[in-house]
């Protein structure tokens, strides 16, 4: 435990996650409920189907949110706290957690009870699944457009090579 606390003091990445977990680290370790899932980890770490992260990796041209009209940067916190596309899912979450959806408050809720953990996990699963499906659809559409452009160029090139 002391080694973990020391490593967290000298962090190199994941600042927001560390700051959220550090105050409840002992409770996090001792809890008997909840398991981390892929999608829950995406929201806690900010590494997932978020415009900022995908843009940084070169998989999106901008970091803007594709799901709302605000033009805000798409981050885990934007998804958790603000994005209008997830209002219904957020309503279910707030009913259990209260209105403070800051990362430290969400982590405290998760550690505090299995009901809290399940509410946060359910939000993450539902929202991230929808975001992943939307990202795959954007990739398919982009790939289809790219193939159509290549095919048209090839046809023109083939036509130019035909004898008169």
PLM features: what roles do these ranges have?
Residues 1-44:
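Acidic catalytic cores of enzymes that act on phosphate-bearing nucleotides/polynucleotides
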Residues 28-164:
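Family-specific functional microsites
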